[in-house]
């Protein structure tokens, strides 16, 4: 056999290529529709995850053009929710009603998730602290029980369309990265003393935790869950 390193295609911008906003929007719509069309080609029923967010909603919208009876699935987390978090169910129901598609709701509890943590750790190939993988498991189990073995997902859309908070953090940098390093050090130190039990406090601390770093190091810091100093302890 022959092995070869995979090299992903790199976009080569033509020097005279001019793309306006309207053309960009139409292009993204066409590419996304074609991608969904390809995934709808299956010899088994196809369903979809639906959180009510932009990514999954767009995918379901295009999928419905091929199958008006497509079944969608979402999660309802029972119990008290963390302050500052959003319940996807209300948005998923609004989108399902707007698109006139069926929506199955999987109800889960923190007790159920806690009991399945060990299963998640054994199943995944790498250490991941995000329990969202369990949501995928529960939805997939229900879908399979109903005879649906293929589910379309909007996972990865936040990376492609800059939907994470770290992308917004990068957008704020022009307001403060020009400050002298001593002032940025102060921002870093002061923000670290904010109340970490408060969602806003944690996010401000995260934003300025790399204020004393430069360029690429600051970008890496936005992607990190554990600070370097904590790793050294």
Label the predicted regions.
Residues 1:
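Active-site-adjacent helix-turn-beta-strand microarchitecture at beta-sheet edges
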Residues 7-233:
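ATP-dependent adenylate-handling active sites, centered on carboxylate activation for C-N bond formation
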């Amino acid at each position: 056999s022959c092995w070869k390193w995979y090299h992903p295609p790199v976009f080569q911008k033509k020097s005279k290529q001019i793309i306006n906003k309207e053309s960009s929007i139409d292009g993204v719509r066409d590419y996304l529709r074609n991608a969904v069309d390809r995934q709808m080609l299956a010899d088994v029923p196809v369903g979809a995850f639906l959180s009510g967010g932009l990514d999954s909603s767009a995918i379901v919208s295009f999928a419905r053009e091929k199958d008006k009876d497509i079944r969608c699935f979402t999660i309802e987390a029972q119990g008290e929710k963390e302050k500052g978090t959003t319940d996807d169910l209300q948005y998923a129901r609004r989108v399902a009603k707007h698109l006139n598609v069926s929506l199955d709701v999987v109800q889960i509890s923190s007790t159920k998730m806690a009991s399945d943590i060990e299963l998640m750790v054994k199943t995944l190939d790498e250490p991941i602290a995000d329990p969202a993988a369990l949501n995928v498991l529960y939805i997939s189990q229900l879908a399979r029980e109903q005879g649906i073995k293929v589910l379309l997902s909007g996972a990865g859309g936040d990376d492609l369309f800059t939907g994470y908070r770290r992308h917004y953090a990068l957008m704020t940098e022009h307001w403060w990265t020009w400050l002298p390093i001593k002032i940025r050090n102060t921002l870093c130190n002061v923000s670290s003393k904010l109340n970490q039990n408060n969602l806003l406090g944690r996010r401000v601390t995260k934003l300025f935790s790399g204020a004393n770093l430069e360029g690429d190091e600051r970008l890496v810091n936005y992607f990190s869950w554990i600070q370097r100093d904590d790793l050294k302890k």
